[in-house]
Amino acid sequence: AYPAVDKNVPLYILGSSTDSAHLAARKGLPYVFAGHFAPQQMHEAIQIYKELFEPSEYLAEPYMIVCLNAVVAETDEQAEFLATTQAQVMVSVTRGRMQPVQPPTDDLQGILTPREFELAKQRMEQSLVGSEATVQAKLESFMQEHGDIDELMAISYVYDQQEQLASYKRLNNVISKVNNSN
């Protein structure tokens, strides 16, 4: 990276809590919420940012980006299976012991403690996981619940690179359909 002296580099507030939503709103800056690992506060943070936003020299209106986990496969079952890699990554972060991305498993409950399994379930509850039709329904529901989101950022920990690429292509199809229907 190079210093951006005399460049107009936009400043964003990146956050995963309501505190960051308050800061972004008060400063009149774009806000990026880390819903991929902090979904519990996402709804409240989005609401706070939009309701308390103060126009600034940077922005006249709020600009909201949300990052979500996304795994889109041919079937819901295949997507759920592939998403077990993502769940393992989340648990690894929580344990404080990052490890290489692990292959998906048919027995997630068998490799996690009951507490870790519940944590993974909670952290994945706002994720876009499923077939294209399922993810489209989830995304439309998300947009209806949260109103205007300016950008969606997706993260996808899929073990197999070809499956990951296919997942991103399917997600692109879904987003195109959702955008065309609005």
Please name every model-derived segment.
Residues E44-L52, Q162-S181:
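C-terminal helical cap(s) of enzyme catalytic domains, especially alpha/beta-barrels
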Residues L11-L14, Y31-A34, P62-N69, D150-I155:
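Hydrophobic faces of well-ordered beta-strands that scaffold small-molecule active sites
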Residues D6-V9, E125-Q126, V158:
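Short, contiguous strand/loop micro-motifs
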